[in-house]
């Protein structure tokens, strides 16, 4: 997303969703890092806007992702969210409260990008691994598959539940395109061996 810029400075608005459980504690640490970053980069101006979302908000207002929060996320340059949902807080049909997945679907945040990098040899159980030896990127599709079937499952009998896993050409192609774009950017070395699995 683009941000408003004034001369050499830049101002970014971040919608902050602390969430539930350990979420607020994790968010406090993340905000401390952002505040320190602003001290180191005086031209960077961050406007942090707290927003209500999650299981606690569901209990309070009946909505895990209020319209005002969704609009704040839409208007922001970035969204920073922590853990959401509590095991004992359920919707009337028994499903957990998952506003983070609602956000993914609303904004089509289909890429789950998960880097894996070894910074220190002691961080790895692999005996010969040295810093930099482990450097890979995992991409996960975040909106299709079993995510698509939330609330659409079928219970034909009391002991059985059927679910639907959805994979579309559009969803697959956009993820593959993103994966190859990231591979071009990284391009540390050529792949020596690749394995393929049939996708049913």
Model-derived features: where do they sit?
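Glycine-rich beta-alpha junction loops
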Residues: 52-54, 142-143, 195-199
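Short beta-strand segments at enzyme active-site cores
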Residues: 49, 81, 189-193
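N-terminal glycine-rich phosphate/adenylate-binding segment common to multiple enzyme folds
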Residues: 58-165
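Short, ordered loop/turn segments at secondary-structure junctions
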Residues: 19-21, 53, 84, 118, ...
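Extreme N-terminal starter segment of soluble prokaryotic enzymes
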Residues: 9-14
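Glycine-rich phosphate/diphosphate-binding loop of Rossmann-like nucleotide-binding domains
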Residues: 15-32, 37-41, 157-199
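N-terminal beta-loop-helix "entrance" segment that forms/cooperates
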Residues: 43-67
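A short, basic/flexible loop-to-alpha-helix module at the beginning of a structural domain
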Residues: 1-7
């Amino acid at each position: 997303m683009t941000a408003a810029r004034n001369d050499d400075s830049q101002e970014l608005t971040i919608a902050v969703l602390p969430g539930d459980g350990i979420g607020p504690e994790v968010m406090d640490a993340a905000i401390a890092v952002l505040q320190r970053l602003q001290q180191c980069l005086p031209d960077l101006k961050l406007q942090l806007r707290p927003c209500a979302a999650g299981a606690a908000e569901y209990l309070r207002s009946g909505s895990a992702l209020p319209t005002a929060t969704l609009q704040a996320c839409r208007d922001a340059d970035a969204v920073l969210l922590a853990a959401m949902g509590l095991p004992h807080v359920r919707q009337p049909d028994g499903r957990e409260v998952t506003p983070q997945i609602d956000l993914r679907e609303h904004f089509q945040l289909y890429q789950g990008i998960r880097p894996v990098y070894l910074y220190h040899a002691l961080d790895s159980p692999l005996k010969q691994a040295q810093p930099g030896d482990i450097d890979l990127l995992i991409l996960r599709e975040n909106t299709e598959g079993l995510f698509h079937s939330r609330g659409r499952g079928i219970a034909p009998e009391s002991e059985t539940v059927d679910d639907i896993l959805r994979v579309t050409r559009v969803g697959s192609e956009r993820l593959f395109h993103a994966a190859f774009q990231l591979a071009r950017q990284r391009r540390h070395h050529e792949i020596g061996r690749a394995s393929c699995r049939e996708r049913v």
